[in-house]
Amino acid sequence: AVYVRPQDVHKIRTMLRKHLRSGQRSIHFTKERPEVRKAVIADIAKMSIKAELYKVAEKHREARSICLQALAGTLRDGKCQQLVLYQNDSVCQSDRRVLRSALGPGWSGTYDHLHDHQEALLWLPDAISWCWNKGGAWRARLSDIDLKIVPLAR
């Protein structure tokens, strides 16, 4: 999860989009060249963001539900008013069910599923999690980012 202050959204989107090649709609770290990854991470390190990386042992679908429940708890108790999730049609319905249950009626914010070409801010958690999972020098590039590792148990 990456938290961006509303007043920084436009500036951060602009910083990220400058890394797009002509005709490219989004940045996905798995597909990028190393020099692009380095430049994007260097820019992310300059951004005023907060990131949380949730770690779970479960497999994808179950892990996603566990992570969403934890994220919902953070949202419910915090000041965040908008949640944007990467749109994966196979899990959207499940995501909505988990969020409705975990957020309850008291949260006044909104949430939506968007594709990464629709919302550049979705590139932030992709880049950060890719670097963390890659380890070594890539993980070291995250040292200037306000990053909290959150271990989750079932």
Describe every region a protein language model picked out:
Residues 2-154:
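Phosphate-ester processing/binding pockets and catalytic centers
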